[in-house]
Design a protein with these regions (language model features):
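A structural signal for short secondary-structure junctions
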Residues: 399-403, 429, 525-526, 535-540, ...
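Extracytoplasmic/secreted envelope proteins and their assembly/folding machinery
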Residues: 64-67, 71, 92-96, 138-141, ...
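Juxtamembrane segments of multi-pass membrane proteins
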Residues: 53-58, 62, 73-81, 87, ...
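A short beta-strand structural signal in non-transmembrane regions
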Residues: 78-86, 96, 110-170, 405-412, ...
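Membrane-embedded transmembrane helical bundles of large multi-pass transporters/channels
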Residues: 1-49, 55, 105, 132-377, ...
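Extracytoplasmic
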Residues: 60, 64-65, 73, 85-127, ...
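Adenylate-forming
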Residues: 70, 396, 757-758
């Protein structure tokens, strides 16, 4: 025993010294981890979660520029679409009148058209007098819903939507983590050889997860997607590291006492785990290069999770293994993982059949995956589970349709041009309705931006003509329009909105006095005009709000956007026009998808091939392994095409990186075992035995990642998160099947090529033994 330990020290002196320090100072490390965990638990609430994917669009995209401009120049008041079921029209009208009189409600649309009433169901379109993100607006919405609580009511609103989405995600995560915990324990019970290993694994996993989640505040804000899946993915991606150390310990413990076994096992596991983690981290790093910046958000958090997992395995788990060593010795049981010799024999027998089929299959999968229907809007997706919030929104959309709103932003300063543009837009078949200052009626058929002379204005608001002339003269003087004063103001025309606001300001300043009736009319109209002005007229730009007759995304929508842009371009310079809405956001995401897809595919493959090149000292092996996993990625995303399902673009990008970066480890395990075994046995026997030796590791890690993906898919009520989970579950399962049923044949057939492409005489690295 002493001789073996001495040999290990000579072979790996630095690692042995480091491992000895970690094991002997384990109590100190326990204390450090306890302090860090307490700090991280307290820090979790400091993390802000962003539920808006548009904030991750590149700054150069039209949608991002438009959203930033609207935030700075325009006010968007809170609104809600409220569905009341099983009511007559008269009942609905009474309720609408009641709601319209409530505090905080500035406007309510309801009539007897199909857009607002049909089949005993009514839709109230309510606009409030404050912005959507204020507590007052949320309170007003709650009061409206309370007033309608005696009826069967559903609603869709931008007010408090982020909070409702966050609550849904938090509730989903509790269920996901509980189910994942059950699956993890079940898998560990099935694949372990001693029951006392399980608390060691679980403690290590939990600590690593707490450290990662508690340090997310370093980045200020993280996306809801990252927040939802990071913990579960961390467990699935990093479980290999704990398994490697535990297996090393069990091997060394056969002829060494517990302390020496842990030290030697750790000294050997550190380089092996570090090497294994590089491929996974490379996939995360590749995501960070995406134009769509959520890739950076997910990539850096998941890369951090891998690092913290290694920290927990290197500095916490050795002490736990030593602490639990007696229990581990006393709770040994027979391994439940079966030998898969039959699969190995199948691989040997089909070594000339499967590789050609694999090549053809990969080529077909490549073309099919490119033909899949990629979607960019979560409204196009459906989740298996629906929260009360999502169900309420779906009911409104089901009965009265989704609202596809588009904002058109143009330079302001010419009301006549705006009115002409709005009239042109109203004639388009793709436009259901459009609103701007130029087509909002003020009084008696006059629009807010129509120009009126003093007589017209006086007749409109029932004002003496002499008073009107005086007010117009004061306005001309205020605007330094001396030409109007010289030529006389009787023909001087001023836009109604400008003259109205000028008179109101003069009244408020005490410069003029109006009779009671006129003052009441002025006051009542002022708030409505201000609401319209705040939403549609900015410091430098005007905004038109359109409702489209097309889906959120697709060729029809793209054509509609082009038609709208070309129509507006008849009146404005095309470079000064901005279109902003779900439709443009989806288009921008689609435009960046092709580039991001290339970045993910090329960088992950390149990073992994470089790592494998140094690991195996062969130019041929990395190509075989990467092609196998890339083939599984294409096969994964060809399934939706065959099943006539939509593919969420973010799911494709994220899972492509994870699948290449993480599941390549399964191929590495089999390949490293095979390369070692074939040095002292025939290659056919080596392939069979390599599968038997690698299967426990693959089934443990793989089943956890597959389960994590499918649990996320079927539990999450957020369609985007669910789509990523489904793609992850399918992708990992595809990789496992391909690695077990096609990689051995590829290795056997490519053995000669691999031998010829060795950079030096083959010597299996010790950490891959």
């Amino acid at each position: 025993m002493a001789d073996n330990a001495e040999k290990d020290k000579k072979d790996n002196s630095f690692m042995m010294k480091l491992a000895t320090l970690i094991v002997d100072k384990r109590k100190g490390f326990y204390l450090i981890f306890i302090v860090l965990c307490i700090f991280c638990v307290l820090s979790m609430n400091r993390v802000k979660v962003n539920n808006d994917l548009t904030t991750y669009l590149p700054d150069t995209t039209e949608t991002r520029r438009g959203l930033d401009l609207m935030d700075s120049e325009f006010t968007t008041y809170g609104s809600a679409r409220i569905l009341i079921c099983n009511v007559t029209f008269d009942e609905a009208q009474k309720l609408a009148d009641q709601v319209e009189e409530m505090d905080g409600v500035s406007m309510l649309d309801f009539d007897d058209t199909e857009d607002h009433y049909h089949d005993m169901e009514a839709l109230l379109s309510v606009t409030f007098d404050e912005e959507a993100d204020t507590e007052a607006t949320q309170q007003h919405l709650d009061e409206v819903l309370d007033a309608l609580s005696d009826y069967d009511v559903y609603y869709s609103s931008d007010i408090g939507q982020e909070e409702r989405d966050a609550d849904d995600l938090n509730n989903d995560m509790i269920v996901i983590l509980l189910l994942a915990a059950v699956v993890i324990v079940a898998v560990l019970l099935f694949t372990s050889t001693t029951y006392a290993e399980i608390p060691v694994y679980l403690t290590t996993f939990i600590v690593a997860a707490i450290l990662n989640k508690g340090t997310n505040y370093w980045f200020g804000t993280i996306s809801f997607v990252t927040n939802s899946i990071a913990v579960v993915l961390q467990l699935g991606l990093a479980v290999d590291y704990a398994i490697i150390l535990a297996h090393r310990f069990m091997e060394e413990h056969e002829d060494k006492d517990a302390r020496e076994a842990v030290i030697v096992a750790l000294s050997k596991a550190i380089p092996e785990i570090s090497s294994s983690s590089l491929t996974t981290i490379s996939g995360m790093v590749a995501m960070m290069f995406m134009q769509f910046r959520i890739g950076y958000d997910m990539g850096i958090i998941l890369a951090k999770s891998i690092i913290f997992s290694m920290v927990a395995v290197f500095f916490l788990m050795p002490g736990l293994l030593l602490t639990f060593s007696k229990a581990i010795d006393n709770t040994h049981h027979k391994s439940f993982v079966p030998k898969i010799t039959a699969v190995g024999k199948f691989c040997v027998a089909t070594r000339y059949i499967i590789p050609p089929i694999l090549i053809v299959g990969v080529i077909i999968a490549f073309f099919l995956s490119n033909k899949a229907n990629y979607v960019y809007d979560t409204n196009t997706l459906e989740s298996s589970t629906m929260s009360d919030n999502k169900f309420s929104v779906s009911m409104v959309n089901k009965e009265f349709g989704m609202v596809n709103q588009l904002a058109v932003i143009v330079p302001n300063g010419d009301y006549e041009k705006e009115a002409q543009t709005l009239k042109a837009l109203e004639k388009l078949d793709v436009v259901k309705s459009c609103q701007g200052l130029g087509n909002i009626e003020a009084m008696d058929g006059y629009m807010l931006t129509d120009k009126l002379n003093p007589r017209q204005f006086a007749e409109l608001i029932d004002l003496d003509i002499e008073v009107a002339d005086m007010l117009y003269s004061a306005y001309a003087l205020d605007q330094s329009d001396y030409g109007a004063l010289v030529s006389g103001v009787s023909e001087y025309e001023v836009p109604f909105i400008d003259m109205f606001l000028f008179i109101y300001d003069q009244k408020e300043s005490g410069n003029i006095t109006l009779d009671d009736d006129l003052e009441e009319t002025l006051t009542d109209a002022y708030s409505q005009i201000c609401i319209a002005k705040d939403q549609l007229l900015g410091e430098d730009n005007s905004r038109f709000v359109l409702e489209l007759n097309v889906p959120y995304e697709g060729e029809e929508t793209t054509a509609a956007l082009d038609q709208i842009r070309n129509t507006v371009a008849k009146f404005y310079n095309i470079d000064d026009i901005l279109l902003v809405g779900n439709a443009t956001s989806d288009k921008d995401l689609g435009d960046s998808f092709a580039t991001d897809n290339t970045i993910i595919t090329v960088l992950t493959a390149l990073f992994v091939m470089i790592i494998l090149l140094f690991t195996f000292q062969s130019a041929g092996l990395p190509v075989l392994l990467v092609v196998t996993i890339q083939g599984s990625i294409w096969m994964n995303f060809s399934l939706p095409y065959l099943l006539n399902e939509n593919v969420y673009f973010l799911g494709y990008l994220v899972v492509s990186a994870i699948q290449m970066g993480a599941t390549i480890d399964y191929a590495i395990v089999i390949t490293s075992r095979y390369m070692d075994l074939k040095t002292y046995m025939p290659i056919k026997e080596a392939a069979i035995e390599a599968l038997n030796q690698a299967f426990p590791t693959i089934v443990t890690s793989g089943s956890m990642l597959v389960s994590a993906g499918f649990i996320i898919s079927y539990v999450s009520s957020n369609a985007a998160v669910a789509a990523i989970g489904l793609a992850l579950g399918r992708g990992t399962l595809t990789s496992i099947l391909l690695v077990l049923l096609a990689l051995p044949q590829t290795l056997l057939i490519g053995d000669i090529t691999v031998s010829y492409t060795h950079l030096r005489a083959h010597e299996t690295p010790e950490h891959l033994v």
